[in-house]
Amino acid sequence: MKLYTFEVHGERRYGAELKSQLVDLPIAYTALLTARGSQPGALPALPLTLLQFIAAGEPALTAARAALAFMAKRPALPVGERATYLVEEVKLLAPIPRPGKILCSGLNYRSHAKENPNAKFLEDPRFFAKVPSVVIGHGESIRHPGLRYQVDYGVELAVVIGQAMHHATQQNALSHVFGYTILHDVSARWIEFKDNNETMGKNFDTFCPIGPCIVTADEIADPGRLRLTLKLNGQMMQDRTNEDWIFPLPRMLEWLSSAMTLEPGDLMSTGTPCGTGYFRKPQVFLKPGDVCRLEIEGIGMLENPVVAAGN
């Protein structure tokens, strides 16, 4: 199931993809209950936000699947009710506009570590944080602070936590995963590497595009065998599979949850492959007017234009 958060008629909604349309899940599920009547054990309603939906777990997913099957039959809805939209009719937002935590793995691709002359291969995964307020969605603009900041790009697979986890093991870690999305790790390298100020360099406003959707874990057979690409103005800059990971996904989740509780809706990003602009010769940095297009197989495409910060 591909799940989206979107805005329509000035209201924030969420839904799932069905035959190239978006189904408003809370409305569709209410219509299903009205048509069939309540059933033993059924949810009385779906939550109002995608974050609440994720936290509701399997009962919410079961209800959503039933709602999609109902809408596939093109039922007549009450006058004034609408549950389906074309993608062009809505504004896509970040699937989780304000995640509780955004934790990103650094130097987790062998190819990326090798292109960095100062990198050291570590015994344990390395993480940094992005703050929730820098998140934007598909189609929104990355605001460029100025050329001296050396703004760089990086495509990453992000894990969406479904069940709270603390001290997970590699054997059970994936059972806590709700799904996967695309994260664009935008960085101001001049700030990041000047005085080793990674937190500020990673957290300029708009420096964390996420989307376009969350794909539920059951649709990704092996998250460790996906192809990731990033194109800058149509030119391929990154193209790798995550078989290049240094630390596999269960190991990253085990390590991170040994220190903190990961909660429903938290994001853990798994690193970027080689091809980032800072380590190219000559270097390539983002500038106003650029367009970044990120794709991960099985998930979709995340595209964002770059504009000057004052625009």
Walk through the language-model features, giving the residues of each:
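N-terminal non-catalytic cap/leader segment that marks the start of a structured domain
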Residues: M1-F121
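A generic local secondary-structure boundary/capping motif
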Residues: Y4, K91-A94, E115-N118, I142-V151, ...
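Short, structured patches in soluble enzyme cores that scaffold and shape functional sites
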Residues: E7, L107, K130-P132, G139, ...
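Catalytic-pocket segment enriched in acidic/His residues
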Residues: H9, A76, H112, S187-N311
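Structural signature of FAD isoalloxazine-binding scaffolds in flavoprotein oxidoreductases
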Residues: A16, K120-G137, Y153, K287-G298
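Residue "hotspots" at secondary-structure boundaries inside conserved domains
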Residues: A94, K101, Y149-V151, E254, ...
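Residue-level recognition of short, solvent-exposed, well-ordered loop/turn junctions
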Residues: P97, C104, G137, D152-G154, ...
